[in-house]
UniProtKB/Swiss-Prot annotation:
GN (gene name): rplW
Matches recorded under InterPro entries: Nucleotide-bd_a/b_plait_sf, Ribosomal_uL23-like, Ribosomal_uL23/eL15/eS24_sf
Cross-referenced NCBIfam families: PRK05738.1-3 (NF004359), PRK05738.2-4 (NF004363)
The species this protein was found in: Saccharophagus degradans (strain 2-40 / ATCC 43961 / DSM 17024)
Family: Belongs to the universal ribosomal protein uL23 family.
Pfam families per record: Ribosomal_L23
A Gene Ontology biological process term: translation
Protein name as catalogued: Large ribosomal subunit protein uL23
Record SUPFAM superfamilies: Ribosomal proteins S24e, L23 and L15e
Keywords from the named record: Ribonucleoprotein, Ribosomal protein, RNA-binding, rRNA-binding
Length: 98
């Protein structure tokens, strides 16, 4: 795969209560990814950027919320979330990640 594409696939980690519970319980990390990203691209990007072995990837599309603005109703953008399960004994520490 194109190296430039792999660097653009991951937009950042998702920091929430649910992602913290999943990280502790199932050795998983949650990322916000580009809407056009595929599972093999996400797996390759995580393995390349963080030097870990990925067991599997699950993705879901998050629908944007409808919010009120001073101009009426507005819509937040839809986005894609990826749950990445790492091999046993592997972990990603975002504080020291390159």
């Amino acid at each position: 795969m194109n190296l430039e594409r792999l660097y653009k696939v991951l937009l950042g980690p998702v920091i929430s209560e649910k992602s913290a519970v999943v990280a502790d319980k199932g050795n998983q990390v949650v990322f916000k990814v580009v809407k056009t990203a595929t599972k093999p691209e996400i797996k390759a990007a995580v393995e390349k950027l963080f030097n870990v072995n990925v067991r599997d990837v699950r993705v879901l599309n998050v629908k944007g919320k409808t919010k009120r603005t001073r101009f009426g109703l507005g819509q937040r953008s839809d986005w894609k979330k990826a749950y990445v399960r790492l091999e046993q004994g592997q972990e990603i520490d975002f504080a020291i990640a390159e």
